[in-house]
């Protein structure tokens, strides 16, 4: 019998939505991740967090607490999901691609501090100046400009299936 734990890091609430959806499917409760969270007694730990500057927030901490073969990671971001985005994120965060799931999150400017807003403004400016923008870049630029919720809870179903299928 597997014991599952779902933990999340969320600043604006979008990642929390995914964590609660996944936890509900696994019949457990999603918990806000805090460094030092007890994960030893669980056979599978699902870590949900957001991407900022190419890094999955607090991933290094959870990786120090959970064995790689027990850890599944769901990352939310402003870019639309794609195989290329997943590969890049896995490489940049030193994760096995088969344990990483990337989904669209959201952007609520009212919940961000000055520093995060300034950083996002720089990202937006860089994208605006990019001469060879592709469709994903254009969509990310639109999302960075307008903000909003881009959550699609069903996009986390492959993670749920993989967690349940892994025996």
PLM feature spans:
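N-terminal beta1-alpha1-beta2 submodule of the flavodoxin-like/Rossmannoid cofactor-binding fold
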Residues: 1-67, 161-166
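Residue-level signal for well-ordered alpha-helical segments
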Residues: 3, 39-40, 77, 133-136, ...
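A sequence-composition feature that detects small, non-aromatic residues
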Residues: 19, 23-25, 30, 60, ...
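Helix-loop-strand module that forms the ligand-binding subsite of alpha/beta enzymes
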Residues: 34-115
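Glycine-rich phosphate/pyrophosphate-binding loop and the adjoining helix
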Residues: 119-167
């Amino acid at each position: 019998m597997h014991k599952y734990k779902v933990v999340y890091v969320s600043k604006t609430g979008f990642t929390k939505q995914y964590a609660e959806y996944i936890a509900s499917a696994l019949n457990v409760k999603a918990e806000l991740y805090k460094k030092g969270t007890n994960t030893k007694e669980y056979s599978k730990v699902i870590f949900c967090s957001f991407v900022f500057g190419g890094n999955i927030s607090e991933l290094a901490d959870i990786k120090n607490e959970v064995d790689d073969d027990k850890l599944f990671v769901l990352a939310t971001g402003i870019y639309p999901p794609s195989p290329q985005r997943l590969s890049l994120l896995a490489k940049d965060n030193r994760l096995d691609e088969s344990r990483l799931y990337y989904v669209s999150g959201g952007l609520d400017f009212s919940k961000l501090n000055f520093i995060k807003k300034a950083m996002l403004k720089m990202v937006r400016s860089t994208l605006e100046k990019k001469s060879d923008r592709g469709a994903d870049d254009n969509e990310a630029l639109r999302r960075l400009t307008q903000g909003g919720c881009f959550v699609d809870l069903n996009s986390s179903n492959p993670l749920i299936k993989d967690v349940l299928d892994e025996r």
